[in-house]
Amino acid sequence: MTEQRPLTIALVAGETSGDILGAGLIRALKERVPNARFVGVAGPRMQAEGCEAWYEMEELAVMGIVEVLGRLRRLLHIRADLTKRFGELKPDVFVGIDAPDFNITLEGNLKKQGIKTIHYVSPSVWAWRQKRVFKIGRATDLVLAFLPFEKAFYDKYNVPCRFIGHTMADAMPLDPDKNGARDVLGIPYDAHCLALLPGSRGAEVEMLSADFLKTAQLLRQTYPDLEIVVPLVNAKRREQFERIKAAVAPDLSVHLLDGMGREAMVASDAALLASGTAALECMLAKCPMVVGYRMKPFTFWLAKRLVKTDYVSLPNLLAGRELVKELLQEECEPQKLAAALLPLLANGKTSHAMHDTFRELHQQIRCNADEQAAQAVLELAQ
């Protein structure tokens, strides 16, 4: 009599954010099925949870076209090898975590071999290159989506999708401790405080920092006690920001922070930020915000033709209306940015209404995503 094989889940994560999601999923699955086996491409967090790494996650974590081209042969070799080895292993379910350019083709290859496939984290198909939805539909048995409007998009195309809530919404409290964050950053409780977040990429910091600093100078005229906090993701971005500040606003006193973006948001009365995940995090920190963004004119021209949504920031996409002010391209200039931020720093009716809506949206996407994802995997495995 042969011993029954344990539940076997294959996973591929391609970057740190995927490693965090994968570790949370493995943890939730082990609580339900303690003897389950996990194999695939994993980072340190997934490996710490017991995932057997056939390849290290760093192998897939390449950014930019030039870097990808330089590594293309290796990436194609890894994908072909995984197709073969997973095909032989026949896991109960394959979970591709983000990394859509690598994972969706792999999912399609495995599905053809009769393996059930899940794509965890929807690519932004609802915003641009919408035809990708058909490839995703052919390659996967189920998409796990963080946001409710993503599920609505897949439903329109009859692609099975489950809204599981957002892990960031699970990790952040509904009512953040503003005074606690100010203690950490050394900001007086009674001061007005503004967070500047000019982005995590070099091009964004280059394009936005000068206008963000000039905006802060204008606001300081109205609020002389204004404390300005600037969290920067790494030493390179800090150096870049300091260079721009020396040229544009050498006398403006600011608190430069290494990381600590979340603390800066929680501590602040308002934030001026580039779009992206930071806007969602800022919403969850209950910090009223203005989104300012600029890109090269040709890139913007192209984006306007490709992007199919009315808004660029996640709070507005979640609310289905302009909840936070978005000032893009030529609109992203100090006078307009300052005018949009002034009522938020006043901490009056506008701020309180925004705060209340942020809290409602937080509750909508706070669904214990790790548990929901684990449940979806087990249901598909049956």
From Swiss-Prot:
Entry's Gene Ontology cellular component terms: membrane
Pathway(s) it belongs to: Glycolipid biosynthesis; lipid IV(A) biosynthesis; lipid IV(A) from (3R)-3-hydroxytetradecanoyl-[acyl-carrier-protein] and UDP-N-acetyl-alpha-D-glucosamine: step 5/6
Domain of life: Bacteria
Entry EC no(s): 2.4.1.182
InterPro entries xrefs: Glyco_trans_19
Annotated function: Condensation of UDP-2,3-diacylglucosamine and 2,3-diacylglucosamine-1-phosphate to form lipid A disaccharide, a precursor of lipid A, a phosphorylated glycolipid that anchors the lipopolysaccharide to the outer membrane of the cell.
PANTHER family: LIPID-A-DISACCHARIDE SYNTHASE, LIPID-A-DISACCHARIDE SYNTHASE, MITOCHONDRIAL-RELATED
UniProt name for this protein: Lipid-A-disaccharide synthase
Species lineage: Bacteria, Pseudomonadati, Pseudomonadota, Gammaproteobacteria, Enterobacterales
Gene name linked to the record: lpxB
